[in-house]
From Swiss-Prot:
In the N-terminal section; belongs to the zinc metallo-hydrolase group 3 family. In the C-terminal section; belongs to the flavodoxin reductase family. This is Putative diflavin flavoprotein A 2. Its EC number is 1.-.-.-. It comes from Synechocystis sp. (strain ATCC 27184 / PCC 6803 / Kazusa). SMART domains: Flavin_Reduct (SM00903), Lactamase_B (SM00849). SUPFAM superfamilies: Flavoproteins, FMN-binding split barrel, Metallo-hydrolase/oxidoreductase. Binds 2 iron ions per subunit.
Length: 578
């Protein structure tokens, strides 16, 4: 039975918001929040047919709610939920994914039902701890874990990281054979049809959604498809759009075909680690973040749940590998063979990076390093060793190590792109001249710097500047809205030594200010003693310029050291490089 409910906010001047409930399986109710007029989803893509936010209620001997809804539905959703179930009897909240359109009402739900146990991946629970700002019961799950609600409803969990967030899990009810997928297999399509009766009408939006959200993680899509392949699925309960019932094999086949095409020419790095061991989760995510800045795809592989075939395939196909030291074989009988599988699969054209996991029983890092070197692999960065608990400086080291690895893999691609520009256009663009500057930033114990030339004044009121910062620059992580920095202006006749210093290729974690005279600005960032002038700035916004961030910042204060001196000028002849 399908029930439609109008939201009180659906007056003519307001977006149309309605609710729909339907029994979709034994003891199972779908709650669909229909957002008819939403025309944009985050910054990722335009919406042509609105969207829906779907959640699901399962009543066994225990009761579980799978996901919640967008905050714009707060009053009507929570009231409907209380009409469907006594919230004091709600036992579990399954969080497949924590983006606000699915988790926006979790704080409100926990106020009404503080006894609820929140079930999700480790990353999801960590995120919710920051979102909720109050203690709550939680249960961390991953592939192989299950939860028995009684009356035949045994929930099985499947890890699906990077679809399209690192926290994603899928939930399968073996009793009803319903697969709950949140964003995966969804589409932004709003209408009253509960199921996918007309695939030809839905296909364009289904593919558009895949291209915008899932295509960049195609290899992760294929891994998720492999994990759900053994399941008998009669209904795919998605988080957006209609539920998939009539054409399941078609939709899953499309994901498979599109992803297979995507990965054929994709350069990617496989990062092997052991989830929950030491601080490997934190380090591998930070290294992966650094790699992603260079445009190289990543594949995170938890060795505690991966199978031999998966490890072998990824180790063979990856352009680069990162390995976090697992516990020694004396404490684990399953991980040592997987290390052997990696060693047997790699080849000399690959690059490698290693890090200690800090679990107390790590495999020794240097013997493994020697094995990879003997097999002919090129080392992308020095082994990352943990002498103390990780700090912000450790995060900086890992992020820069990942960026170095990614830059190594994209170097040839960048060189090819530089030669593809029309020669006359290349020379014409090269006639654009700018000043020379050193951008410095510090946040806590982490500080960085870069030579900058793509700098212009962007506004009078407020006083603002725009700086183009390549996405793979180390300092990029210190230039988000709200961050502060100093723009040091180089002097025409006194810039060579500073320019040469900051053009050096620094190893990951190196002090870029060693040997340079500095003093702190009011905002804490370093001012270079030998520069002509400086401006203290705060980042206001960033515009995505494909390979650069265009960072708009307001000027807080500044000073000139030599009134009669001129700014150093950067003259180019070609536009395809700095």
């Amino acid at each position: 039975m399908v029930t439609l409910i109008d939201s009180p906010t659906s007056a003519a001047v307001q977006p149309r918001l309605t609710l729909q409930t339907a029994d979709i399986a034994a003891h199972t109710t779908a709650i669909r929040c229909l957002d008819w007029d939403r025309d944009r989803f985050d910054i990722e893509f335009e919406l042509r047919h609105g969207t829906t936010y779907n959640s699901f209620l399962i009543r066994g001997e225990k009761t579980a709610l799978i996901d919640t809804s967008h905050r714009k539905f707060e009053a009507v959703y929570l009231q409907l939920l209380q009409d469907l179930v006594d919230l004091r009897s709600l036992d579990y909240l399954i969080v497949n994914h924590t983006e606000p359109d699915h988790s926006g009402l979790i704080p409100d739900l926990l106020e009404l039902a503080p006894q609820v146990t929140v079930v999700g991946s480790k990353v999801a629970i960590q995120f919710l701890e920051k979102l909720v700002h109050r203690p709550f019961e939680s249960q961390i799950v991953k592939s192989g874990h299950s939860l028995d609600l009684g009356q035949g409803h045994e929930l099985q969990f499947i890890s699906a990281p990077n679809l399209h967030w690192p926290d994603t899990i899928l939930t399968y009810d073996s009793g009803t054979q319903v697969l709950y997928t949140c964003d995966v297999f969804g589409m932004h399509y709003c209408d009253d049809s509960l199921f996918d009766e007309t695939p030809e009408r839905l296909e364009p939006d289904f593919q558009y959604y895949y291209n915008c959200l899932m295509g960049s993680n195609a290899r992760s899509v294929l891994m998720a498809l492999k994990r759900i392949a053994p399941l008998q699925v009669v209904l795919v309960a998605t988080g957006h759009g209609p539920l998939l019932q009539h054409h399941i094999s078609h939709w899953l086949g499309q994901y498979d075909a599109w992803s297979q095409n995507q990965v054929k020419a994709e350069t990617f790095v496989a990062l092997f680690y052991v989830d929950g061991y030491g601080v490997s989760d934190r380090l591998v995510q930070t290294i992966a973040d650094g790699i992603s800045k260079t445009g190289v795809a990543i594949e995170l592989v938890d060795l505690s749940v991966a199978d031999t075939h998966e490890v072998r395939t990824l180790a063979q196909c990856a352009a680069g590998l990162v390995v976090g030291m697992p516990p020694q074989s004396s404490t684990s009988t399953t991980l040592d063979p997987l290390l052997g599988t990696i060693l047997a699969a790699v080849h000399p054209k690959q690059v490698i990076g290693l890090f200690e996991s800090g679990g107390g029983q790590d495999e020794p890092i240097y013997p493994l390093r020697n094995r990879f070197q003997e097999l002919g692999l090129q080392e992308a960065f020095e082994p990352i060793l943990l002498k103390t608990e990780p700090t912000a400086a450790t995060d900086q080291l890992c992020r820069e190590a990942g960026t170095d690895l990614g830059q190594y893999l994209t170097q040839k691609q960048s060189q090819q792109a530089n030669t593809d520009l029309d020669p006359e256009l290349n020379q014409a663009i090269g006639r654009l001249s700018t000043g020379l500057y050193i951008l410095t930033a510090q946040k806590g114990d982490v500080r960085s710097a870069m030579l900058a030339s793509w700098v212009i004044q962007g506004s009078f009121e407020p006083l603002g500047i725009v700086i183009a910062v390549a996405k793979d620059r180390a300092i990029e992580s210190l230039l988000h809205p709200g961050d502060t920095f100093v723009l040091n202006v180089l002097e025409e006749d006194n810039y060579q030594s500073l320019m040469r210093h900051f053009l050096l290729r620094f190893p990951p974690g190196a002090d870029r200010f060693a040997g340079v005279n500095t003093y702190p600005a009011q905002n804490g960032s370093p001012i270079l003693l030998e520069t002509l002038a400086y401006l203290e700035c705060e980042v206001t916004s960033r515009l995505d310029g494909n390979d650069h961030w265009l960072v708009y910042s307001t000027i807080q204060t500044g000073r000139v050291a030599k009134l009669n001196a001129l700014t150093a000028t950067h003259h180019r002849k070609l536009g395809n490089h700095y």
